[in-house]
A protein has these predicted regions:
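Positively charged n-region of N-terminal signal peptides that target proteins for export
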Residues: 1-6
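Bacterial N-terminal signal peptides
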Residues: 10-19
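Boundary at the C-terminal end of the N-terminal hydrophobic targeting segment
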Residues: 24-27
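Short active-site neighborhood of thiol/selenol oxidoreductases, capturing the structured segment around
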Residues: 32-44
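Typically the conserved alpha-helix immediately C-terminal to a functionally engaged Cys/Sec
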Residues: 50-64
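Thiol-based oxidoreductase modules, predominantly thioredoxin-like and allied folds used
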Residues: 65-84
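Structural micro-motif
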Residues: 89-107
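Non-catalytic, surface beta->alpha helical segment in thiol-disulfide oxidoreductase systems
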Residues: 101-137
Length: 137
């Protein structure tokens, strides 16, 4: 599973470096731009990340078909941290990383890349999904 995740992040990184906008990949599949980006700040060693469990995957499945881009930034080690920073830069959300250090939470970004919410394992799947869906209409 870790190899698959690393491969996906590597592919996204290569697309970014090759000049292929990440949003255009999403647009080609759905026919529209995302109205919200849900970004999970993750690290394998993070207790809060473990407490969050499969919520992010469940959100992705529950909101399939909605104009939501789900991204996981992995801060487990120097290599994954570097890739996470490159991906954040490509998405235009780098300033939020400085304002929201750490892991174990999900940030929601609107179309202008402004943070519209921060969610942790203290919120239920239903609560986080409702917060995301307020931007989907």
């Amino acid at each position: 599973m870790k190899t698959l995740k690393s491969g996906i992040f590597t592919l996204l990184g290569l697309l970014v470096l090759a000049g292929v906008p990440v949003q255009s990949v999403n647009a080609a599949e759905t026919g529209s731009q995302p109205k919200i980006i849900a970004v999970k700040f993750h690290a394998d060693w993070c207790g809060a990340c473990k407490a969050m469990g499969a919520v992010f995957t469940d959100l992705r499945n529950k909101l399939d078909g909605k104009p939501v881009l789900f991204v996981e930034l992995d801060f487990t080690n120097a290599t994954t941290r570097h890739q996470a920073m490159l991906l954040a830069s490509a998405l235009g959300i780098s300033p939020a990383l400085k304002e929201n250090p750490g892991t174990g939470f999900i940030l929601l970004f609107d179309e202008k890349r402004q943070v519209t919410g921060r969610h942790t394992s203290r919120q239920t799947l239903k609560e986080i999904a409702a917060a995301i869906c307020t931007h989907c209409e």
